Amino acid sequence: MRHYEIMFLVHPDQSEQVPGMVERYEGIITKHNGKIHRKEDLGRRQLAYSINKVHKAHYILMNVECNLDALNEIKNAFKFNDAILRHLITVQKQAITTESVLMKKEKETKVA
């Protein structure tokens, strides 16, 4: 199985449905005997440019280990979900379990 980093942007009007979406995608991965190494809800953030006249989106980041069947099923789910504005799936050489830079910055600003 290969390691992947999955980032997807959810329409801000659908923010309350994000936990259900993440649960569904986790279910797809575990159904195919995959593993989730990191899952981060980065919250609602400003977009660099508007997508379909939307200026903010809810960001979700996941690092997973899964086979091609699970990945294709997730891609298909993203494709047919209107709430997903954009998604990006990249191949990683190894499992990434450390906290992302965005989460570290967010925690630093909360402490300060």
Swiss-Prot record:
Gene that this sequence comes from: rpsF
Protein name: Small ribosomal subunit protein bS6
UniProt GO molecular function: small ribosomal subunit rRNA binding; structural constituent of ribosome
Listed Pfam families: Ribosomal_S6
Keyword Ribosomal protein attached: yes
CDD domains hit by this protein: bS6
Function: Binds together with bS18 to 16S ribosomal RNA.
Biological classification of the source: Bacteria, Pseudomonadati, Pseudomonadota, Gammaproteobacteria, Legionellales
Natural source organism: Legionella pneumophila subsp. pneumophila (strain Philadelphia 1 / ATCC 33152 / DSM 7513)
GO-annotated biological processes: translation
Keyword Lipid metabolism attributed: no
PANTHER family: MITOCHONDRIAL 28S RIBOSOMAL PROTEIN S6, SMALL RIBOSOMAL SUBUNIT PROTEIN BS6M
GO CC, one annotated term: cytosolic small ribosomal subunit
Family indicated by similarity: Belongs to the bacterial ribosomal protein bS6 family.
UniProt keyword annotations, A-Z: Ribonucleoprotein, Ribosomal protein, RNA-binding, rRNA-binding
InterPro entries in alphabetical order: Ribosomal_bS6 (IPR000529), Ribosomal_bS6_CS (IPR020815), Ribosomal_bS6_sf (IPR035980), Ribosomal_S6_plastid/chlpt (IPR020814), Transl_elong_EF1B/ribsomal_bS6 (IPR014717)
